[in-house]
Each structure stands twice: as C-alpha cells, then as structure tokens.
C-alpha cells in the first residue's frame, strides 16, 4: 500500500453539478492505487442517517454536522473519505472543516452553472422543483452561496470527468 496523506475530499455544488459522479470515479481511481476509500453521498445520507431532517436552515446545519462528524470518524480508518453534498453556504462548509480538521479537509467546488445543472437534471429534481413538488430547492427556492475559499474549482460542463479526476489527483499530490 502506498503512503497516504489522509484527506476528506468535500465536494460542494448545485444538484446536477457532478458531485456523485466525480466522487464515484475518484473512489475507483484511488482504490486502483490501493488506497482505502469511503464515500458519503448526500442523497444516501439524507435517506438514512438524516431521514429525520427537513430542509430548514436548522436542519441543513444538522445534516452537515452529522456528515462531517461521520467523515471525521471514517478518516481515522481510511486513507480518503469523499463527501458529495450540496452544503449550500460558507457557514456550513466552515462548520464541516472545523469538525473534520484543517489538516484533513479539502474543499472541491463544482462551479457548474445552474443552467447546465438544470439541463442535466439526473434525478429529475429541478423538474419537481419547478412543478412545486419540492420547496426550498437549492439554487431555485433556496440560495446556493459560492465558496469564498476552496482548494480546487472545477466546472464539469467545461472539462471531462477524466480531466476533473486528474485535477483532483494533482491537488492531492498523489499518483
């Protein structure tokens, strides 16, 4: 096994920006290099660990707190933990970083435009939001605040998945 520099790679961006896709592809790449990896996908965490939470500001904060606490525990047993969650504002991302620790936390901002995310709509969520079936949907009814500080910025509408993974691997300074 290669020497690891344990990191939590925290993807933030709008729904449809490519967080889950990149998390899964990054995991495959890292596992091929014999690293241990865990993925925390926002949709999966919301369906299980955070199924009691709604989308109020208070519940969004608690959701991110729980995800960050879990990532903090998992990084003790893994080389990499990959988190794919919208985390819609700087306050929540700062909370996650504080819980996980500055030495472990790497923020990857997927800056893909709202128009691109809406045209992709892989889960049909924008369609539901426009139909009024989802209230306070981030990017439409609820605000997404672009990060003021990040380790890497990627627009997945401008570069390929492969190029995105290469940029992340370079940021992590691994092969």
Q: What are the roles of these predicted feature ranges?
A:
Residues 1-8:
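Extreme N-terminal, non-catalytic leader segments
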Residues 19:
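Conserved lysine of the Walker
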Residues 15:
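The conserved Walker
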Residues 48, 54, 71-130, 136:
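ATP-dependent NMP and nucleoside kinases share a basic, alpha-helical "lid"
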Residues 8, 39, 105-109, 151-153:
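Conserved beta-strand scaffold positions in the cores of enzyme catalytic domains, especially
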Residues 111-167, 174-175:
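Small-molecule kinase domains that catalyze NTP-dependent phosphoryl transfer to phosphate-bearing small molecules
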Residues 24-69:
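Conserved substrate/cofactor phosphate-moiety recognition/catalytic segment
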Residues 11:
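Hydrophobic anchor at the beta1->P-loop junction of P-loop NTPases
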């Amino acid at each position: 096994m290669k020497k690891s520099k344990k990191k939590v790679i925290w993807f933030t961006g709008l729904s449809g920006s490519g967080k889950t896709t990149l998390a899964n592809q990054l995991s495959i790449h890292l596992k091929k290099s014999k690293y241990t990896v865990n993925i925390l996908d926002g949709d999966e965490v919301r369906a299980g660990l955070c199924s009691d939470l709604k989308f109020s500001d208070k519940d969004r904060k608690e959701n991110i707190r729980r995800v960050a606490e879990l990532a903090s525990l998992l990084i003790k047993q893994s080389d990499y933990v990959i988190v794919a969650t919208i985390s819609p504002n700087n306050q929540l991302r700062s909370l996650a970083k504080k819980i996980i620790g500055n030495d472990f936390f790497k923020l990857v901002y997927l800056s893909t435009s709202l128009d691109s995310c809406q045209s992709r709509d892989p889960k049909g969520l924008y369609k539901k939001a426009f139909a009024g079936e989802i209230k306070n949907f981030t990017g439409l009814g609820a605000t997404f605040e672009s990060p003021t500080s990040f380790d890497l910025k990627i627009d997945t509408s401008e570069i390929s998945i492969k190029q995105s993974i290469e940029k992340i691997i370079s940021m992590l300074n691994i092969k």
